[in-house]
Each structure stands twice: as C-alpha cells, then as structure tokens.
Amino acid sequence: MQELGAEIARDYAGREPVLVGSLKACLVFVADLSRAVPIFHSLDFVELAGYGSALMGGHQQIRMLKDLDLDIRDRDVLIVEDVVDTGLTLNYLVRTLELRGPASVAAVTLLDRPYRRLVDDLPVRYVGFVVPDELYVGYGFDLEERYRELPELRLLHLS
C-alpha cells in the first residue's frame, strides 16, 4: 500500500487529484490508499451496477446508482477499483467521467486480471497485484454481500 501511495504522490506532485472509489468492494482499499497518499487529495465515490454478461455472448449494461458529489472539471481523477477484470465497467466509468472535462483520468486497482480484458485501452496506471481467475473475499470483497468484513483478502473455494 505504501508503495502505491508513494508512486501516486510522485506522479501527482503539485496537483490535488480526486480519488474516485467505485463502491462497494473498493471501500476498504480506497480508505487505506487514501491514508497512504501523502499529498493533498479529495475523495468521492460512485456506485455502478452491471446487468447481463458479455462473457456469455450477451451485452452487459451498466448503470450508475450513485454519482459523484464533486465537480471534476479540470481536476486529475484517479479511479480506485477493487479488481479490473473484463474492463467493461471501468471503461464505462472512464468514458462517463471524461464527458465532465477532467484534466486527466487514470485508474488504480488492487487486483488485476489483464488476461480477461475485453477492452484494451484502459488507463490502469497502478496495480497492486496481478492475480489468477479465482474468487477473493474479505477486505471489502464479497460473495452475495457476505465476507466483506474479513480483515484480509482470502481465496474462497466453492465446492
């Protein structure tokens, strides 16, 4: 966490980025990351919901359940994700926020699965860990709203 915070602080030195947490699973990560970024920054949240499955040959539709409270025009925006997988949700969020005239938009993710990408040009600038395609719970990650409270990430093996 300290390494990510230091890298972000170095890249945004002299600026005051807006960290935008994508709820709900990122909540613990964005809180820890915010404390690890030793420069002035703002913090705001969005919540998105995805329906359908692009992986099954269908179309995924994404809708915003909670929008930003802050004005991001001319601000550097750093989207904070729990995991970037296909990239469809992050792509939707990036494109939506870009319409509001920010100075820049980039992303940081705790877990990354680049081998599952369906979108190639995502601005994922900071990655905690590249992980295999397994189910993680705890540290804000859930399975049907359970296990978020666990203090660390754990692999969940379904039988």
Segments predicted by a language model, with ranges:
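PRPP-associated nucleotide enzymes
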Residues: 1-159
